[in-house]
A protein has these predicted regions:
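Short, surface-exposed ligand-recognition loops at beta-strand->loop->(often short) alpha-helix junctions
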Residues: 277-286, 314-316
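A short alpha->loop->secondary-structure connector
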Residues: 103-114
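Conserved small/polar residues in nucleotide/adenosyl-binding loops
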Residues: 327-329
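Short Gly/Ser/Thr- and Asp/Glu-enriched loop/turn motifs at secondary-structure junctions
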Residues: 303-309
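Flexible, low-complexity inter-domain linkers and amphipathic docking helices that mediate domain-domain
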Residues: 1, 271-276
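N-terminal beta1-alpha1 cap of cysteine-dependent amidohydrolase-like domains
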Residues: 1-103, 122-127, 131, 205-206, ...
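Amide-donor transfer/coupling interface in amidating biosynthetic enzymes
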Residues: 38-39, 45, 78, 112-266
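C-terminal non-catalytic interaction/assembly regions of soluble proteins
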Residues: 292-299, 323-325
Length: 329
């Protein structure tokens, strides 16, 4: 029997391709590299997909957002509708969340946030920002997923991210819990749960380490199961292969949830302050990337980034003089 072909999707800034190749080979699958700008037609010939970790497009604007708007991800949605398994690891998870593939409502709207880490003990924040360590995760018994082994045990996996905290609003939280979409949760070595650091390393709601779509064939996971050294996370890839080999009848089901649009209010500066807008005198790669992205979506616009300062004084200081001094530093 021919080995199942798994495409690992690479964007500018992706990494861990070698680890991903090795773990797929170990489990009897055939890894195939697919760059973001390769023909999307090729996706039809793969049996499953992994979106690599890393820093796609240098995380410009927001982690995963630019990659999520690439044509290759639009075609990935079509392949997911057919039942093919899609696993997003770390930055790949961020891309799946931004694209709306996870948790996956009818319109593929962005419903969930993967935001800045917040290490919490009780009601105290003990750390924020990038964090890497080995931790434990365990599968949720009631989650339908192509990436969960029946009676699976806690597994030791590394994390390495700055924006891995799953957040969702109250209405969506109810849907996620009711449908058991949290596929893996952070735990200790015995499988015990806690919302506190260090067991929960980033402050994710309900200790979520991975989130699934309702159909069970798409999963966004923040830890790196492909980086394990001693078979710790084999269950995930073994389950993926078994899911493909089973060739079971598949019927895609979207989450019955519609996002509420938030209207942005126009910013109005306080009349008591002086405003200072600062831009770079060198090329701003972040603004250039955003401009190129929205232009490709049919929105013709120029993008320039400014840093906004407001200067206020509680006494009789000459604010105009202060601003002139700052400009000439």
């Amino acid at each position: 029997m021919a080995k199942k072909k798994i495409a690992y999707l690479q964007f500018p800034g992706s990494n861990t391709e070698n680890e991903t190749k090795n773990i797929l080979l170990k489990h009897g699958m055939s890894p195939r590299g697919h760059f973001w700008n390769d023909s999307t037609e090729k996706l039809k010939y793969y049996d499953g997909f992994i979106i690599l970790g890393g820093f796609s497009f240098e995380d410009r604007s927001r982690s995963g957002i630019i990659a999520s708007l690439e044509p290759v991800v639009n075609e990935l949605k079509n392949q997911a509708l057919l039942g093919k398994p899609v696993l997003g690891i770390c930055n790949g998870a961020q891309i799946l969340v931004e694209s709306g593939l996870v948790p996956g409502n009818e319109k593929f709207e962005t419903l969930v946030s993967l935001t800045d880490n917040k290490r919490v003990v009780g009601d105290r924040i003990v750390g924020t920002g990038y964090f890497n360590k080995w931790c434990y995760i365990k599968p949720s018994e009631n989650t339908k997923s192509a990436f969960i082994k029946k009676n699976g045990k806690p597994m030791r996996v590394p994390i390495a991210h700055a924006e891995g905290r799953f957040l969702f609003n109250k209405d969506l939280e109810s849907e996620i819990l009711q449908n058991s979409l949290i596929a893996y949760k952070y735990c200790d070595s015995e499988g015990n749960l806690s919302n506190d650091f260090p067991i929960n390393p980033n402050g994710s709601l309900h200790s979520a380490a991975a989130l699934s779509n309702l159909a069970g064939n798409v999963m966004a996971i923040m830890p790196h199961p492909e980086r394990t050294l001693q078979n710790e996370a084999d269950d995930i890839f073994e389950s993926m292969k078994n899911y493909i080999d089973s060739n079971s009848k598949f019927s895609y089901k979207a989450l019955n949830f519609e996002s509420k649009k938030i209207s942005l209010k126009k910013f109005n500066k306080s009349p008591k302050t002086k405003e200072l807008l600062v831009s770079t005198i060198i090329a701003d790669n972040e603004a250039a990337s955003v401009e190129k992205c929205i232009n490709s979506l049919g929105v013709k616009a120029k993008v320039k980034k400014y840093i906004h300062f407001e200067i206020d004084s509680v006494d009789s200081l000459d604010i105009n003089s202060i601003i002139l001094s700052l400009i000439h530093i």
